[in-house]
From Swiss-Prot:
NCBIfam families: caca2, cax. PANTHER family: VACUOLAR CALCIUM ION TRANSPORTER, VACUOLAR CATION_PROTON EXCHANGER 5-RELATED. The gene is CAX6. The lineage of its organism: Eukaryota, Viridiplantae, Streptophyta, Embryophyta, Tracheophyta. This is Putative vacuolar cation/proton exchanger 6. The chain crosses the membrane at residues 82-102, 110-130, 142-162, 179-199, 210-230, 244-264, 296-316, 335-355, 364-384, 394-414, 426-446.
Length: 448
């Protein structure tokens, strides 16, 4: 009897230990058709198969090699590498000059222009520092870093604008950031990559593009229903149902974005790194970092703080610039501000495309659009809810229709062949020009 109890508990604990084995294999063990040695061998094959570990092993080896080559620069050397090595940084003094003009004169137009020029080199350096940091983190996390540090500016501007009751500025700026990323940033990255590789169709992971397109379409769906509810006048409680629906959808979108991050970083790591590792094999000479990991983090913090400061001043100058330049506020919010706010993604995506790393370019441009639409927009709705501001997902009919058509066009291009050619490069840029022209002649009746 004791021997039977021992065998029963022994088999029980073995089943817990090997719970990852399929149920039919556990049944064969209990029936004596497979012994323990064979089962352990099958378990090792299941968990250590080449398909699941090849990409992670390649990336780990590449990361170890880069970390071993990490430079140790002094403060002066780091300053020379990051600040003095780029001719575009000659525009850096325009930032302090813009602040000086802001306090000494009332010319909002000049202040706005100087701020735009001053932010441009800072945003490019953000892309550079993020690329350096991605050398120590890997391709997937590197793409998320590019998107995150680029969108910090939009989040700061949005929260400040919400505090000031400028809900429409928040909506238009975030909308413009999405449009700029999926059309202008991606189109320019493809175009610059084509200039470096003129006779080559650059390849990207089509499976990744399909998932990204699905996320963008889900974001559009979340924005469509509050707009349709408003314009069909079918609310159960007029004035409150639209806001309640927006807050509910925002919570769902935040959960979906968290699941997307988990899927991208944990569940399917090889799914997203296979193509990037192939690109790294052909361009290892370009992968040696110029600054250390902590230098990159410090420079990222400095640049982000300075860009955010200038961006905050830009918000206050929007109305004055609209009057001075005689252009609609919607054009400034949807076109001009996002171009500067997305300069980090713009520079990063172009740099990656010029190194034939189109998956990283897509990770920056499309990843940033997903982060804005699935995180920044619903996050602002929730923050506005906490502040008592009636921020909703109703972007109005013209703006929502523009976003819907744009996402459909981009999703169609990304799912065609998994390649970039001159036709796609040209079409994306021309589509953005159409959008820009539309907002130049569009007067927003809800501004204010």
């Amino acid at each position: 009897m004791y021997m039977e109890l021992y065998l029963m508990f022994s088999n029980f604990f073995k089943s817990i230990r090997w719970c990852k084995v399929p149920a039919f294999m556990q049944a064969k063990v209990e029936m004596g058709l497979v012994n323990e040695v064979e089962l352990k061998s099958l378990l090792e094959q299941e968990t250590d198969s080449p398909q699941t570990n090849a990409a992670s092993l390649m990336e780990q080896g590449s990361l170890r090699e880069r970390r071993a080559k990490a430079p140790r620069n002094s403060v002066v050397q780091s300053f020379k590498i990051v600040i003095l090595s780029n001719k575009l940084n000659l525009l850096l003094p325009f930032g302090p000059l813009a602040i000086l003009v802001h306090y000494l004169t009332d010319n909002k137009g000049w202040f706005f222009l100087l701020s735009l020029v001053g932010i441009t080199p800072l945003a490019e350096r953000l892309g550079y520092a993020t690329e350096q940091l991605s050398c120590y983190t890997g391709a997937t996390v590197g793409g998320l870093l590019n998107a995150t540090f680029g969108n910090v500016i939009e989040l700061i501007i949005s929260i400040i604008a919400l505090k000031n009751g400028m809900i429409r500025v928040v909506q238009l700026t975030l909308l413009g950031s999405i449009l700029s990323n999926i059309l202008l940033v991606l189109g320019c990255a493809f175009f610059c990559g084509g200039l470096v590789f003129p006779g080559k169709d650059q390849v990207f992971d089509k499976r990744n593009a399909v998932v990204s397109s699905g996320m963008l379409l889900m974001a559009v769906m979340g924005l469509l229903f509050p707009t349709f509810l408003h314009y069909t006048h079918s609310e159960v409680h007029a004035g409150s149902s639209e806001l309640a629906l927006s807050r509910f959808i925002s919570c769902i979108m935040l959960v979906a974005y968290a699941a997307y991050l988990f899927f991208q970083l944990k569940s399917q790591p090889s799914f997203y790194t296979e193509k990037t590792n192939q690109n790294e094999e052909t361009s290892n000479d370009d992968e040696d970092p110029e600054i250390s990991k902590w230098e990159a983090i410090i420079w990222l913090s400095i640049f982000t703080a300075w860009v955010s400061l200038l961006s905050g001043y830009l918000v206050d100058a929007i109305e004055g610039t609209s009057v001075s330049w005689k252009i609609p506020i919607s054009f400034i919010s949807v076109i001009l501000l996002p171009i500067v706010g997305n300069a980090a993604e713009h520079a990063g995506a172009i740099m990656f495309a010029m190194k034939d790393k189109l998956d990283l370019s897509l990770g920056v441009a499309i990843g940033s659009s997903i982060q804005i639409s699935m995180f920044a927009v619903p996050f602002c709705v929730v923050i506005g809810w906490m502040m008592g501001a009636q921020m909703d997902l109703n972007l109005q009919l013209f703006e929502t229709a523009t976003l819907l058509i744009t996402v459909i066009v981009v999703a169609f291009f990304l799912q065609l062949e998994g390649t970039s050619n001159y036709f796609k490069r040209l079409m994306l840029i021309l589509c953005y020009l159409i959008v820009a022209a539309s907002f130049f002649v569009h007067e927003d009746p809800h501004q204010g």
